[in-house]
């Protein structure tokens, strides 16, 4: 179908499309899960270990408590990620069923909504009416269009909930082992805590830089921002731990 005012693709334009390589990063859900897992993993076990270090307990006890917290935190965070992704999937399916019923029961209203959506992009009725008619002949394409452009919902991946749970849990474990690593090698808790602070800050800087590279933001700015936010969060958690100990 040729839309008025729009030239059909020519062989040369099709060749250009084939030669052009998009460099957009689209795995935003995975990046979000990794950020959630690693950032929490770097912060919570560090605060626990630092708080126990101030109580003059041996490194072995801190290590045992820290590993137990990492295991429990990974399970909890993973379960939270699973439930969140599952809720999104359930919401999508409910809206999909509702939209299917509306297309069957009130097709003229739904067709008018297509026109309203396309008009928001500056298209005139004589331009978008052929598009509306084409979509009415293809119910599945019509349904997909309404889900995406009317409701703003993307179809979740079938295994998204499980993948989210595994990604967050694994990222939490990786992040949590970083501040605990000095306690494996340094028997004196306060010395291990100083090393843990340095290692955790370095990990936050590296993590922020990598995050910036993947998300397209300034890597240096991202690393500084991540380090500052992580340091403030860790300091707040440490202060709360010390306050509880003093009660």
Curated annotation (Swiss-Prot):
Pfam families: VIT1. InterPro entries: Ccc1_fam (IPR008217). Residues 1-33, 82-167, 213-219 are cytoplasmic. The keyword Ribosomal protein does not apply. Its main location: membrane. It comes from Tulipa gesneriana (Garden tulip). It is found in: Vacuole membrane. It comes from the Eukaryota. This is Vacuolar iron transporter 1. Vacuolar iron transporter involved in the transfer of iron ions from the cytosol to the vacuole for intracellular iron storage. Plays an essential role in the development of blue coloration in tulip petals most likely due to the accumulation of ferrous ions that can form complexes with anthocyanins. Expression of VIT1 with simultaneous RNAi silencing of FER1 results in cells of a darker blue color compared to expression of VIT1 only, indicating that VIT1 expression and FER1 suppression are critical for the development of blue color in the perianth bottom. Belongs to the CCC1 family. Residues 55-60, 189-191, 241-247 are vacuolar. The chain crosses the membrane at residues 34-54, 61-81, 168-188, 192-212, 220-240. Expressed at high levels in the blue epidermal cells of the inner bottom part of the petal (at protein level). No detectable expression in parenchyma and epidermis of the purple segments of the petal, parenchyma of the blue segments, leaf, stem, bulb and root (at protein level). High levels of mRNA in the blue epidermal cells of the inner bottom part of the petal. Low-levels of mRNA in the purple segments of the petal, stem, leaf, root, bulb and pistil.
